[in-house]
């Protein structure tokens, strides 16, 4: 395995709360996938949920080395939890196309939050062919 990219992001949760207060659900609609949106709508802590998703998606965009531009959008990165509760990343659209082009075979996600901050790190790996 070879590391293709590493990205980290930290989000101040109060900043997400301020944006939601000013513009309603517009940020959530821009950031969340359809599956994440369904969870956000009924989540007990929607601001914290959105902040954590935002941190993972920013970290992923940094790991890809692109940021959110050139056809990539936040909602093309979907954060979900596996059967053990571990955060995972699913890609759609241009994000998936880019991952395939780069030869990404595995994505590692770590996510943490405390009272004021949410932090995420994403590592992209590629399988090295013997030769």
Curated annotation (Swiss-Prot):
Keywords attached to this entry: Cytoplasm, Fatty acid biosynthesis, Fatty acid metabolism, Lipid biosynthesis, Lipid metabolism, Magnesium, Metal-binding, Transferase
Cofactor(s) annotated in UniProt: Mg(2+)
Segments forming a coiled coil: none
Localization in the cell: Cytoplasm
Cellular component GO terms held in the UniProt record: cytoplasm
Single GO BP term: fatty acid biosynthetic process
Catalysed reactions, as listed in the record: apo-[ACP] + CoA = holo-[ACP] + adenosine 3',5'-bisphosphate + H(+)
Binding site for Mg(2+): 9, 58
EC number: 2.7.8.7
Any Pfam family: ACPS
Known function: Transfers the 4'-phosphopantetheine moiety from coenzyme A to a Ser of acyl-carrier-protein.
Protein name as annotated: Holo-[acyl-carrier-protein] synthase
GN (gene name): acpS
């Amino acid at each position: 395995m070879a590391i293709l990219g590493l990205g980290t992001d930290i989000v101040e949760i109060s900043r997400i709360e301020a944006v939601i207060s000013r513009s309603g659900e517009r940020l959530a609609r821009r950031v969340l996938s359809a599956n994440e949106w369904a969870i956000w709508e009924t989540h007990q802590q929607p601001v914290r949920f959105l902040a954590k998703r935002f941190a993972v998606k920013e970290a992923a965009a940094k790991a890809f080395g692109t940021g959110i531009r050139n056809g990539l959008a936040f909602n093309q990165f979907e954060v979900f939890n596996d059967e053990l509760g571990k955060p995972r990343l699913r890609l759609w659209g241009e994000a998936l196309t880019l991952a395939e082009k780069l030869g990404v075979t595995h994505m590692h996600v770590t996510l943490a939050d405390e009272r004021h901050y949410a932090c995420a790190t994403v590592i992209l790996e590629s399988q090295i062919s013997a030769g």
